[in-house]
């Protein structure tokens, strides 16, 4: 049985990575695909754990070689998911989660129409602003650009299957887990997973 592909997107500062990490800790059946990026690591970020950090030239080379499942220019830097991180795992029956932006999500849905997509929203504009400022990693000019980009990102929430409002972290994580559980209980998935049982029951 082929694995399920999950897409999770959110504006910067909505708590996407924290929710994803907490959810995956509860649900080890899902593998997180580590994205490639051309930007420099931020303080505390480690290669191959948070991102695969490569130069812009290396990223372009991967584009030309057709190595990416999806890629997009995000906040002036390239981000993308390698084919090798997704296609073999799905074919082997493993569930894979992509933590990407709306541009990448749109590309993925064109290739995998049955992918399950989730968009995370902040509880308010004020909360988004406060969360972004707590990072303390950007200048005011960069902060203004990121807030504008966050608004642009949120305009695309209607393209996703599920929406989570991250007002209370534990509730948001529980809602993400519920989405994964519901996906596994879909009739098509259960029909494949329990084909022998269903056949025996209906004989």
UniProtKB/Swiss-Prot annotation:
ATP binds at residues 10-17. Residues 3-181 form the Guanylate kinase-like domain. One of its GO terms (molecular function) is guanylate kinase activity. Pfam families: Guanylate_kin. InterPro entries: GK/Ca_channel_bsu (IPR008145), Guanylate_kin-like_dom (IPR008144), Guanylate_kinase (IPR017665), Guanylate_kinase_CS (IPR020590), P-loop_NTPase (IPR027417). SMART domains: GuKc (SM00072). The keyword Cytoplasm applies. It is found in: Cytoplasm. Disulfide bonds: none annotated. Its EC number is 2.7.4.8. This is Guanylate kinase. The gene is gmk.
């Amino acid at each position: 049985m082929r694995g399920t592909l999950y897409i999770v997107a959110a504006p910067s500062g909505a708590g996407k990575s924290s929710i994803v990490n907490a959810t995956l800790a509860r649900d080890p059946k899902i593998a997180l695909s580590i994205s490639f990026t051309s930007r420099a690591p931020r303080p505390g970020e480690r290669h191959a754990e948070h991102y695969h950090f490569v130069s812009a030239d290396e990223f372009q080379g991967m584009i030309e070689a057709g190595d990416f499942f999806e890629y997009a220019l995000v906040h002036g830097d390239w981000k993308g998911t390698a084919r090798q991180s997704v296609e073999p795992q799905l074919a082997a029956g493993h569930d894979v989660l992509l933590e990407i932006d709306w541009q990448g999500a749109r590309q993925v849905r064109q290739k995998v129409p049955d992918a399950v997509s989730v968009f995370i929203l902040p509880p308010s504009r004020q909360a988004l602003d406060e969360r972004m400022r707590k990072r303390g990693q950007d200048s005011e000019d960069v902060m203004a650009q990121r807030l504008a980009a966050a608004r642009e990102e949120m305009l695309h929430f209607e393209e996703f299957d599920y929406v989570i409002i991250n007002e209370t972290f534990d509730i948001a994580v529980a809602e993400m887990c519920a989405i994964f559980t519901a996906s596994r209980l879909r009739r098509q998935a259960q029909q494949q997973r329990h084909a022998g049982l269903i056949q025996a029951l209906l004989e």
